[in-house]
Amino acid sequence: MALCGLASWLAACSSTPPPEVPEKCDLQIVTSAVITSPYINPSERGEPRPVQVRIYQLKSDVGFLNSDFEEVWKKDAEVLGEDLVKAEEFPVYPDTRTEVKFERDDAAQFIVAAALFRNPTGKNWFKSFELPPSPADGQCGARCPDGECAEGPVLDPRFYIWIDDTRVEDGIEYADYFPEGGTLSAAPTEAAQ
């Protein structure tokens, strides 16, 4: 009888341990591909010029949407206040594709691409993109080579930004027409407008 009790006790101790909980992702790399037409940021004589682009990581884009160009250009930290998480600035040139990769801050819910044009018009000088859930909100799982998984969240999001004249737009439709390191060719008809 004691032998049976010992056998039961050993069987209970040797049961399969519970599965390990996957570790949370602690890093998300965001890629922004800025694609420019040959006609960006025209000078007074109509010649294309390079333009500075700022990529903002924001908690909310409402303050940005309610701001004007001069406010953001001259005093972005003051205007955006606590919504501003991080900002990065770099030049882009006519008829090019520039890829910028950065680590997403967990507090950021939006990225905004803003071009500091010579003569901006209306609200066309920026484009806001909502970020997928923060990596801290989900499980890591397997990294996906193309940035998207068949099931589950986008682990490393990619955004395409199109700049033409003095406009910043969602550039996904131009991604295939301007390969990385290439020049603009056979763009959709909207590119010529």
Label the model's feature ranges.
Residues 28-30, 49-51, 96-98, 109, ...:
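Envelope-exposed proteins and targeting segments
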